[in-house]
Amino acid sequence: MAAKDVKFAGDARDRMLRGVDILANAVKVTLGPKGRNVLIERSFGAARITKDGVTVAKEIELEDKFENMGAQMLREVASKTNDLAGDGTTTATVLAQAIVREGAKSVAAGMNPMDLKRGIEIAVAAVIKDLVKRAKPVASSAEIAQVGTISSNGDAAIGKMIAQAMQKVGNEGVITVEENKSLTTEVDIVEGMKFDRGYLSPYFVTNAEKMAVEFDDAYVLLHEKKVSGLQSMLPLLEAVVQSGKPLVIIAEDVEGEALATLVVNRLRGGLKVAAVKAPGFGDRRKAMLEDLAILTGGQLISDDLGMKLENVTLKMLGRAKKLVIDKENTTIVGGAGKKADIETRVGQIKAQIEETTSDYDREKLQERLAKLAGGVAVIRVGGATEVEVKEKKDRVEDALNATRAAVQEGIVPGGGVALLRAKKAVGRISNDNPDVQAGINIVLKALEAPIRQIAENAGVEGSIVVGKILENKSETFGFDAQTEEYVDMLAKGIVDPAKVVRTALQDASSVAALLVTTECMVAEMPRDAAPAMPGGGGGMGGMGGMGGMGF
């Protein structure tokens, strides 16, 4: 076992604080509308430029092991905030640094670290209560756009795109962010349900230009097993032909004779038909077929229910206003399923999402939920260079996470104002224990840190900004760092999601309080470099005769 280096008390805290400061100082330059970028070296390819706090934090590794431990604890703050809220990582880092700094000073002055921690926790609970009380629900698309604009660093186009996507696919819908090959950033919205299975034969194609099958007002047959012969389906196929409507068969597979017969009938023009493999595998395939049955108002033909293909009637088939099938995807728009049934199914999937412990299962369930509940939107981020696209994509992802958080828990005035105003709630708390009271005062001072940093990044003195805002009695009065004016933050659309602010403070105080109570640090001693190998060149003289090899 390697020897360990142990540091105690002030020495340990000083080294840890140096690490905290290095990481926090690198991250906090990105805060606010006038925050700067950070350039990060990559082991291969071009360097990456970003304004995303957690991306910067994840890149920092320090040589001194004790400093590095402090930095890694602070990195945990950014990562946790990113996991829970998806944004607010820089705010969380700034808050944590402020609490650790003040806490270290108090410990050095002889205060009890455990009492300080208790005071920090009491104050944070009061701030969170105040934030929840003050949060305003997000009602309109314009408010969603405002949140997106602020989180993407004042880019109104991104805010508008996210609002447009959320309006189309609903709050439950899936919105993904991808890189675009062109210069423009655009939104692609897929309404209805889309799954990644295409037609089983190109002979089903109705639109040769797009190489796609396009049916209006079609029947949908959902079958759990393979379809290998059509004999049992003949009565159903005849009924479909008489109805004059197209038919789409979605089954585990349609093979051999059955597929050939369908293709021949399609080419002769007697039957408008297409066949598609069912999406997913195993149990997930069955669940997705059941989703499709509920969406289209049909029944899943399943052996478990004792159903046979020969007994299927038109009433048992699903219906859809429009079906588009290309080589790789199938999209069903306007399924005939009852709204109440779809809502019940959505509720079941939500319950499964809460119960599951597997990230993979959760992701797949969320995909199913989105497909049933609204649709899918893809924001394709474009730019002149790869570096620009990556930087913009970071901002779009932050903005998207922020808007989702805003929809969940509402919004509060942005630009650090909500935390600054929460000082009033903390100021009302008093404790008989002076060390606990000192912990409360640490949070009281730390609540100013984000707004000070936003002001300083804009080149304005933070103390003046804080003083001016606190002089004004309006709860929504604040500093717009973009224009360097004092405005009504809500009226100007400068807002933060309450969830992001809450999560940032909770995570920052949790890790910072632990750092304040640290009295000893243990790290592995650096090993001395191994002695160099003895020079062996002297004995190789006889190799000189190889000169005639002609290399």
UniProtKB/Swiss-Prot annotation:
Chaperone in keyword set: yes
Subcellular location: Cytoplasm
Domain of life, per lineage: Bacteria
Keyword Electron transport: no
Annotated residues for binding of ATP: 30-33, 51, 87-91, 415, 496
Gene3D superfamilies to which the protein is assigned, alphabetical: GroEL, GroEL-like equatorial domain, TCP-1-like chaperonin intermediate domain
Enzyme superclass (EC): isomerase
Alphabetical keyword list: ATP-binding, Chaperone, Cytoplasm, Isomerase, Nucleotide-binding
Gene Ontology CC entries for this record: cytoplasm
Any one Gene Ontology BP term: protein refolding
EC assignment: 5.6.1.7
Reactions mediated catalytically: ATP + H2O + a folded polypeptide = ADP + phosphate + an unfolded polypeptide
Single GO MF annotation: isomerase activity
Pfam families: Cpn60_TCP1 (PF00118)
Subunit architecture: Forms a cylinder of 14 subunits composed of two heptameric rings stacked back-to-back. Interacts with the co-chaperonin GroES.
HAMAP family referenced in this protein's UniProt entry, alphabetically: CH60 (MF_00600)
Family label: Belongs to the chaperonin (HSP60) family.
Function summary: Together with its co-chaperonin GroES, plays an essential role in assisting protein folding. The GroEL-GroES system forms a nano-cage that allows encapsulation of the non-native substrate proteins and provides a physical environment optimized to promote and accelerate protein folding.
NCBIfam families on file: GroEL, PRK00013.1, PRK12849.1, PRK12850.1, PRK12851.1
Protein's UniProt name: Chaperonin GroEL 2
Organism for this UniProt entry: Rhodopseudomonas palustris (strain BisB18)
